[in-house]
């Protein structure tokens, strides 16, 4: 492994490691053991959905007052995509690029632990954005910090599915145009992949640091 690359999911992410990654502009890659954890959890979730007749909140059901509404297997990804789109409503001032990179770093690390049920490609695309300074535009207001930084994290994740705007090469660009430039397909969300990205407090975490 190059000294200019840090393997996400290879161990504890300390303040010292975070500082080095940001200050030395290190690139990120998934550690082999992280890939195994992510895939194992995704496989478990797929099996659970296929084999269980019980509703799984926010996965095979709607959210909140719609928790009694069952979602068909063909609409599980659409449910998650709609969750991201509907919550991407942060307002206020644009968050500084260095904080956006920190949020993506924390997000990638959390997902690399293999407890969220996301696809490998989802985590890899976060790393692609980080490594190429494709920085989602996120605003600093819109979070209670209770069940997660819902609106800011939805805005952070929105460009991965080809929606919203990013800062790239010093300019504000449509996310889909930057995806096309790199030859990246928008991530097609599967079950739980809208819940997983927004159910953290990565924006508020940088303030405590």
Segments and roles (model prediction):
Residues 27, 54-57, 102, 135-136, ...:
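Structural motif
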Residues 6-10, 30-37, 71-75, 91-95, ...:
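Catalytic cores of large soluble enzymes that bind and process phosphate-bearing ligands
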Residues 12-13, 17-20, 24, 69-98, ...:
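Glycine-/small-residue-rich beta-strand-loop submotif within the FAD-binding core of flavoenzymes
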Residues 17-20, 44, 82, 102, ...:
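Alpha-helical scaffold segments in soluble metabolic enzymes
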Residues 202-205, 209:
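Single conserved hydrophobic/aromatic residue that forms the stacking wall/gate
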Residues 55-68, 140-159:
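Conserved phosphate/anionic-ligand binding catalytic regions in large, soluble enzymes, centered on
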Residues 2-51:
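N- or domain-start disorder-to-order transition segments that initiate the globular core
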Residues 46-50, 75-138:
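Anion-binding (especially nucleotide phosphate/pyrophosphate-binding) glycine-rich loop
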């Amino acid at each position: 492994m190059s000294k200019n690359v840090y393997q996400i999911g290879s161990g504890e992410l300390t303040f010292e490691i975070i500082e080095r990654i940001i200050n030395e502009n290190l690139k990120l890659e998934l550690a082999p053991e992280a890939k195994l954890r992510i895939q194992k959890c995704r496989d478990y979730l797929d099996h659970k959905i296929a084999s269980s007749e019980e509703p799984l909140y926010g996965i095979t059901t709607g959210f909140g007052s719609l928790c009694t509404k069952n979602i068909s297997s063909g609409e599980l990804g659409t449910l998650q995509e709609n969750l991201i789109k509907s919550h991407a409503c942060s307002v206020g001032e644009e968050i500084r690029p260095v904080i956006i990179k920190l949020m993506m770093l924390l997000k990638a690390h959390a997902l690399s632990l293999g407890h969220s049920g996301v696809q490998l490609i989802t985590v890899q695309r976060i790393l692609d954005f980080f490594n190429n300074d494709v920085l989602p535009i996120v605003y600093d207001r819109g979070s209670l910090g209770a069940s997660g930084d819902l609106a800011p994290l939805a805005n952070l994740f929105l460009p991965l599915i080809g929606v919203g705007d990013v800062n790239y090469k010093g300019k504000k660009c449509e996310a889909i145009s930057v995806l096309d430039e790199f030859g990246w397909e928008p991530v097609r969300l599967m079950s739980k992949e809208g819940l997983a990205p927004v159910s953290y407090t990565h924006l508020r975490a940088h303030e405590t640091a």
